[in-house]
């Protein structure tokens, strides 16, 4: 018999409804979170090279936390803002 976590993490934390309040649409949220997750991932990749081109996580992280989870917590915390661009 499998075990079920009593406090599931991931997309349920932060709640999707709270995240949607921070953007204009669910599609904007996906793009916003994905771009920030790529930045966080690039930051971790460049640490060993001594380059500091990207901004690291703006929230406390755990060692195995995924960049997308970090990005969503940053968005939910109001630490990031989405700026509309004129580019397609």
UniProtKB/Swiss-Prot annotation:
On whether Nucleotidyltransferase is a keyword of this UniProt record, the answer is: yes
Q: Name one GO cellular component term.
A: DNA-directed RNA polymerase complex
- Which Enzyme Commission number(s) are on file for it? 2.7.7.6
Q: Name one Pfam family in it.
A: RNA_pol_Rpb6
Q: What class of enzyme is it?
A: transferase
Q: Report the record's disulfide bonds.
A: none
Per its record, what are the GO molecular function terms? DNA binding; DNA-directed RNA polymerase activity
The protein here is known as: DNA-directed RNA polymerase subunit omega
* Family (UniProt): Belongs to the RNA polymerase subunit omega family.
What does the subunit comment say?
Answer: The RNAP catalytic core consists of 2 alpha, 1 beta, 1 beta' and 1 omega subunit. When a sigma factor is associated with the core the holoenzyme is formed, which can initiate transcription.
Q: Which superkingdom heads the taxonomic lineage of this protein's source?
A: Bacteria
Q: What taxonomic lineage is listed for the species of origin?
A: Bacteria, Bacillati, Actinomycetota, Actinomycetes, Micromonosporales
Specify the species.
Salinispora tropica (strain ATCC BAA-916 / DSM 44818 / JCM 13857 / NBRC 105044 / CNB-440)
List UniProt keywords, sorted A-Z: DNA-directed RNA polymerase, Nucleotidyltransferase, Transcription, Transferase
């Amino acid at each position: 018999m499998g075990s079920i976590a009593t406090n599931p993490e991931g997309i349920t934390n932060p709640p999707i409804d709270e995240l949607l309040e921070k953007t204009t649409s669910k599609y904007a949220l996906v793009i916003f979170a994905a771009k920030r997750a790529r930045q966080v991932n690039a930051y971790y990749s460049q640490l060993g090279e001594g380059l500091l081109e990207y901004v690291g996580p703006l929230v406390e992280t755990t060692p195995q936390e995924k960049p997308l989870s970090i990005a969503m917590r940053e968005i939910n915390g109001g630490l990031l803002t989405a700026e509309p661009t004129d580019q397609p």
